[in-house]
Amino acid sequence: MEVVEVESPLNPSCKIMTFRPSMEEFREFNKYLAYMESKGAHRAGLAKVIPPKEWKPRQCYDDIDNLLIPAPIQQMVTGQSGLFTQYNIQKKAMTVKEFRQLANSSKYCTPRYLDYEDLERKYWKNLTFVAPIYGADINGSIYDEGVDEWNIARLNTVLDVVEEECGISIEGVNTPYLYFGMWKTTFAWHTEDMDLYSINYLHFGEPKSWYAIPPEHGKRLERLAQGFFPSSSQGCDAFLRHKMTLISPSVLKKYGIPFDKITQEAGEFMITFPYGYHAGFNHGFNCAESTNFATVRWIDYGKVAKLCTCRNDMVKISMDIFVKKFQPDRYQIWKQGKDIYTIDHTKPTPESTPEVKTWLQRKKKLRKPPKSLQGNKPLCKRPKPEEDEEFAEFSGEEGANPAMGPRHLKVTEKPEKALKLGKLEESSAKEALDTRIQVDQSLLNDTKLSGKGCISSSVTAEIPPEDNRASAVISPSQLKEGADCIPLSHGHQAGKESHLLKILKLESPKIPSPLPESNKVLTEGEENDEEGHGSNLEPGEIPEALSEERNGLNIPKIIEGQPKTTKSWRHPLGKPPARSPMTLVKQQVASDEELPEVLSIDEEVEETESWAKPLIHLWQTKSPNFMAEQEYNATVAKMEPNCAICTLLMPYYKPDSSKEENDSRWETAVNEVVQSGRKTKPIIPEMCFIYSEENVDYSPPNAFLEEDGTSLLISCAKCFVRVHASCYGVPSHEVCDGWLCARCKRNAWTAECCLCNLRGGALKQTKNNQWAHVICAVAVPEVRFTNVPERTQIDVDRIPLQRLKLKCIFCRHRVKKVSGACIQCSYGRCPASFHVTCAHAAGVLMEPDDWPYVVNITCFRHRVNSNAKSKTCEKAISVGQTVITKHRNTRYYSCRVIDVTSQTFYEVMFDDGSFSRDTFPEDIVSRNCVKLGPPAEGEVIQVKWPDGKLYGAKYLGSNVAYMYQVEFEDGSQIAMKREDIYTLDEELPKRVKARFSTASDMRFEDTFYGADVIQGERKRQRVLSSRLKNEYVDDPVYRTFLKSSFQKKCQKRQ
């Protein structure tokens, strides 16, 4: 067997290996894979296999132009300095022909380049420009019938146990996926679902570049990503499984993370190994096919794979059947949680084991005639249409797992003969219009219900939804000749019975337009409370409608005994953030948060604000008072988080608490005793101290942290400021009993921060020999630490003049002069500005943010707005109460609550991984929930779906939804949710105030007022404008007038 590029049989350098098997060696996939690992190929996490020249998976690719790409995605990328976040936005369906034309157009085509290195540089340089379209996650195969060698649709590996024993088919995991790429389409850093193997074959087109990190160094990449993206990390431990994070090779190289790269040409295979992180991009238009597979070596990886916990539809495979079947000697101790096993990433997989041989022999005996996997299989049953609103914004929340993938409404056909993607027949528009559907109605009526799902006897269709998902069931008889149809997938029906689905027109998603990263000045008049600032994509970028040649339906056929089907989302959908760029300075003209006029502190007026009372002697406008600084530092050292730098993310003052509670918290801290030598975990991420990737003096992250992630709390012997050694940049050998902070070492008793108006706290010297708070240097965007590990040489020279002119809403009336540099609220275009220490003292919420932002700041107004919905829902509304809500004319009016209804819904997780949180209790057929109440949490149940079939599920919980029937003054009624209703004592949002009117149209005046009042105060009759005399007017009186006039004219003519 020929092996090139790497000579060492064990591959100690973990380099990507390339293999060139002979035709004889190529015939047995599992045997050759074991050979590859015996040479150490798995240590790189990625390997290339160049098949024999005589092997062809498909003879011709000219006949796939009409293959439908049901849900293309547009990949928007944000970020800088080698650290990026990718968001996938679903677009309208198109054919391969249309996609190829788009990929080769001047807007999306590959730029000119000298070599692959030059193209790679252009990729990382232009990553954030011109969002490309990716035809990803298309369930199906384009292998020719009869190709047995390395057939991605049937590799015959131990992963087949999932479908054979459990009857579950996971699209893209144990079925093949097709990918149509164009220049710059990307797959972000990730390992495979459940840390499985994967295989990728590039059928034709331009090359594909790959990056790979050896499995033995995967944890290092995770730690680096957690540091750069702390917000994502806090939301989900396995956030890299979201497939949204891009880290450039230059960043990996800088932080010492081993990686290798390779280019895959057309006609070559790439194999990824368990826990091998990989990423890459396409050089231009191409077509690839891939799937997952497994060996016995993978089982130990699957047992410890870290799974995404924030999304309900991420792939999760029960390891029970694998351990029981292939590791029987360890099954019992594994079930007891005592199977302690450390994975050896260097160990190759065995060619076979007695358990595998037994399984293969049994499989051969039970093997049925091969069934084609070509074409699309139907998806799993999806949540009800009522959940559609949650998908509209491509949100990342996971009630019913919104926005994590394009929810296709699948339709499967069965032609007269077995039809494959490779043998698609073109049909004209006329033929499509003449197509008739004839379905034996008895098949629909006589289908027996069962918990495992029923055999399909209906024709189903597939819709790539845009902003949301919607469906309506119709009978075959409702299909009209010439009705708009969409192409059917080609292959067999798998799983549950589908229905004919009515196609609903959905709007294209709106994409927030990015703000220019310049020092743009915004006045408050320009502020927009809405989080998203969107505009439609350029017209013509994606074909607006399906072409006529894609219309038509074929007669279905019953396929028996098919497994349930779920789906793996390789490129989940996401929503780009709508927020201001890091360097944007928004000038404040007049803020709603401005404090009432207060005389200057210098005039010795008693402070009334609770948050400002402890600071009375710390304002820089007062004479230096080192004893006051000592007292303040010593007091706050006893308050969580016990570090003067970590406190940036955990302020001492709690604005939501009462005045008495805040005063009590401060008094308690004064009387506490400081514990010395304690180690705690810093809550401020290390990456908050990094300004950009160009910090060349920066050593590996967390240089001064202990191995367990903790750091020693140390206190200055003179000023009593308390900090983590790692946060303040103190090496372990400098920590001693009489440790002094930087300002006390220099006896700088009058030192004060040049970035704010307060004294005290942890200070470091700047490059121009001034002083600055470490927390100010962290939070002000343009300030950087030249020496990051030691937090020294603070550079403040890059602060723009616009920022220096901003006025702090907290101290502008407490001091006589404007000084320091303010930060601003991160919400949209909010111009609220404040000093870092003032905002911290007042309790403004600051949180670590993902790169390239450092902290996310939320002012009080937007903190209230973000919680308004939940707080509003806490207030009860009764029948007869006067409230404010939106009328059908889109304006807001006062109205009266006339009825309140409630409905209890159950939250269930179906066997195929789909999720519903609005299941009616009466739909649970395995238990009489109306009489007995809900089942126990986690109990297995049977759910009757609207399609009339039964599905297995697990009960997760319940929720209650309330609807309020309101009546307006004009007599019209409407049912509203609680979050859409405002009581008279609630503060109305600005957008509601702008559209609030005192009375609706008095169409039914006598309902509310007497005839005498109406006669005297009736509105004047509206007259139709002469400009609109030729326009259609939706007015019954006017239409009656026109009709009578027309009839009179006709009578005269007669």
From Swiss-Prot:
<dbReference type="GO" id="GO:0030521">
    <property type="term" value="P:androgen receptor signaling pathway"/>
</dbReference>
<comment type="function">
    <text>Histone demethylase that specifically demethylates 'Lys-9' and 'Lys-36' residues of histone H3, thereby playing a central role in histone code. Does not demethylate histone H3 'Lys-4', H3 'Lys-27' nor H4 'Lys-20'. Demethylates trimethylated H3 'Lys-9' and H3 'Lys-36' residue, while it has no activity on mono- and dimethylated residues. Demethylation of Lys residue generates formaldehyde and succinate.</text>
</comment>
<keyword id="KW-0804">Transcription</keyword>
<dbReference type="GO" id="GO:0003713">
    <property type="term" value="F:transcription coactivator activity"/>
</dbReference>
<dbReference type="GO" id="GO:0045944">
    <property type="term" value="P:positive regulation of transcription by RNA polymerase II"/>
</dbReference>
<dbReference type="GO" id="GO:0140684">
    <property type="term" value="F:histone H3K9me2/H3K9me3 demethylase activity"/>
</dbReference>
<dbReference type="InterPro" id="IPR013083">
    <property type="entry name" value="Znf_RING/FYVE/PHD"/>
</dbReference>
<keyword id="KW-0408">Iron</keyword>
<feature type="binding site">
    <location>
        <position position="134"/>
    </location>
    <ligand>
        <name>2-oxoglutarate</name>
    </ligand>
</feature>
<dbReference type="InterPro" id="IPR003349">
    <property type="entry name" value="JmjN"/>
</dbReference>
<keyword id="KW-0677">Repeat</keyword>
<feature type="region of interest" description="Disordered">
    <location>
        <begin position="361"/>
        <end position="407"/>
    </location>
</feature>
<dbReference type="GO" id="GO:0008270">
    <property type="term" value="F:zinc ion binding"/>
</dbReference>
<keyword id="KW-0156">Chromatin regulator</keyword>
<dbReference type="GO" id="GO:0010468">
    <property type="term" value="P:regulation of gene expression"/>
</dbReference>
<dbReference type="GO" id="GO:0050681">
    <property type="term" value="F:nuclear androgen receptor binding"/>
</dbReference>
<feature type="compositionally biased region" description="Basic residues">
    <location>
        <begin position="361"/>
        <end position="370"/>
    </location>
</feature>
<dbReference type="GO" id="GO:0008284">
    <property type="term" value="P:positive regulation of cell population proliferation"/>
</dbReference>
<dbReference type="GO" id="GO:0005634">
    <property type="term" value="C:nucleus"/>
</dbReference>
<dbReference type="InterPro" id="IPR002999">
    <property type="entry name" value="Tudor"/>
</dbReference>
<feature type="compositionally biased region" description="Acidic residues">
    <location>
        <begin position="386"/>
        <end position="396"/>
    </location>
</feature>
<feature type="domain" description="JmjN">
    <location>
        <begin position="16"/>
        <end position="58"/>
    </location>
</feature>
<feature type="zinc finger region" description="PHD-type 1">
    <location>
        <begin position="687"/>
        <end position="745"/>
    </location>
</feature>
<feature type="binding site">
    <location>
        <position position="242"/>
    </location>
    <ligand>
        <name>Zn(2+)</name>
    </ligand>
</feature>
<dbReference type="Pfam" id="PF02373">
    <property type="entry name" value="JmjC"/>
</dbReference>
<dbReference type="InterPro" id="IPR034732">
    <property type="entry name" value="EPHD"/>
</dbReference>
<dbReference type="GO" id="GO:0051864">
    <property type="term" value="F:histone H3K36 demethylase activity"/>
</dbReference>
<dbReference type="GO" id="GO:0001825">
    <property type="term" value="P:blastocyst formation"/>
</dbReference>
<dbReference type="InterPro" id="IPR040477">
    <property type="entry name" value="KDM4-like_Tudor"/>
</dbReference>
<dbReference type="InterPro" id="IPR001965">
    <property type="entry name" value="Znf_PHD"/>
</dbReference>
<feature type="binding site">
    <location>
        <position position="243"/>
    </location>
    <ligand>
        <name>2-oxoglutarate</name>
    </ligand>
</feature>
<feature type="binding site">
    <location>
        <position position="208"/>
    </location>
    <ligand>
        <name>2-oxoglutarate</name>
    </ligand>
</feature>
<dbReference type="InterPro" id="IPR003347">
    <property type="entry name" value="JmjC_dom"/>
</dbReference>
<keyword id="KW-0560">Oxidoreductase</keyword>
<feature type="domain" description="Tudor 2">
    <location>
        <begin position="933"/>
        <end position="989"/>
    </location>
</feature>
<keyword id="KW-0863">Zinc-finger</keyword>
<keyword id="KW-0805">Transcription regulation</keyword>
<dbReference type="GO" id="GO:0003682">
    <property type="term" value="F:chromatin binding"/>
</dbReference>
<dbReference type="GO" id="GO:0032454">
    <property type="term" value="F:histone H3K9 demethylase activity"/>
</dbReference>
<dbReference type="GO" id="GO:0010628">
    <property type="term" value="P:positive regulation of gene expression"/>
</dbReference>
<feature type="binding site">
    <location>
        <position position="236"/>
    </location>
    <ligand>
        <name>Zn(2+)</name>
    </ligand>
</feature>
<dbReference type="GO" id="GO:0019899">
    <property type="term" value="F:enzyme binding"/>
</dbReference>
